[in-house]
């Protein structure tokens, strides 16, 4: 046992400026990039610092260069968790007050992302032995999950505001109704890991043809 118990000090609570983590999710064409840059501009007016845009979408963020002032960071594959962390850290070190990431979904299912890394780990551990691959499936998640945890922990140490864009897909589920199988809509599901979404200060969904106006209706979210 510890012979010297830890001591803790309580002070009056004072509101401080806490960095924002904002998640914008939606299908293609829902206005994620424009909305993210508009949000970033509003945040910058309060907190200062430069706006940095990390672009994994083949330079598409540059379409809005005439509308918003920001520094563009081209981010190509691989899209590993630690690659994202390095990009975020470099932006903050360079003076970013707000960082827009479009798209964060590549960290989950893009080349070099979490799902891709788990598949590579399966190849390393079991090769083409399909029975063994099934046995070590959970073990193969250890490295991808550790890398994502490192991303999250590192992100939370950065003194800047972040706006993350997530792709979303419309999901369905087969359901038995009166002995027949019917396809029931389940809403939009963001392409991202739950543990990353949980860290956001706020998440909102941009529906198609919404003009960038978010919806908070739970039935629209898978």
Which positions does each model-derived feature cover?
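Glycine-rich, phosphate-binding/catalytic loops in enzymes
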Residues: 70, 115-120, 180-181
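Structural motif
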Residues: 98-100, 163-164
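Conserved P-loop
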Residues: 2-7, 12-94, 98, 105-106, ...
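Short amphipathic alpha-helical segments
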Residues: 65-66, 112-113, 175-177
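A conditional alpha-helix N-cap/helix-loop micro-motif detector
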Residues: 80-81, 141-145
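Conserved P-loop NTPase nucleotide-binding/switch module
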Residues: 101-141
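Conserved nucleotide-binding/hydrolysis micro-motifs of P-loop NTPases
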Residues: 57-61, 104-107, 114, 168-173, ...
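Phosphate-binding/switch region of NTP-binding enzymes
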Residues: 27, 146-222
């Amino acid at each position: 046992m510890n012979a010297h118990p830890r001591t803790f000090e309580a002070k009056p609570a004072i509101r401080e400026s806490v960095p924002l983590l904002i998640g914008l999710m939606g299908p293609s064409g829902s206005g994620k990039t424009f909305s993210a840059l508009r949000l970033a501009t509003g945040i910058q007016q309060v907190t200062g610092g430069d706006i940095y845009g990390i672009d994994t979408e083949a330079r598409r963020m540059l379409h809005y260069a005439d509308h918003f002032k920001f520094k563009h960071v081209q981010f190509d594959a691989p899209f590993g968790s630690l690659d994202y962390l390095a990009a975020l850290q470099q932006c903050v070190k360079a003076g970013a007050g707000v960082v827009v990431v479009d798209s964060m979904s590549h960290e989950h299912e893009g080349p070099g992302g979490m799902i891709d890394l788990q598949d590579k780990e399966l190849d390393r551990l079991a090769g083409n032995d399909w029975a063994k691959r099934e046995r070590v499936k959970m073990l193969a998640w250890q490295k991808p999950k550790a890398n994502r945890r490192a991303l999250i922990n590192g992100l939370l140490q950065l003194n800047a505001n972040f706006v993350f864009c997530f792709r979303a897909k419309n999901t369905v589920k087969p359901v038995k109704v009166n002995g027949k199988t019917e396809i029931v809509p389940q809403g939009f599901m963001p392409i991202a890991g739950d543990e990353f979404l949980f860290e956001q200060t706020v998440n909102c969904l941009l529906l198609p043809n919404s003009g960038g106006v978010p919806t908070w209706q739970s039935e629209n979210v898978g």
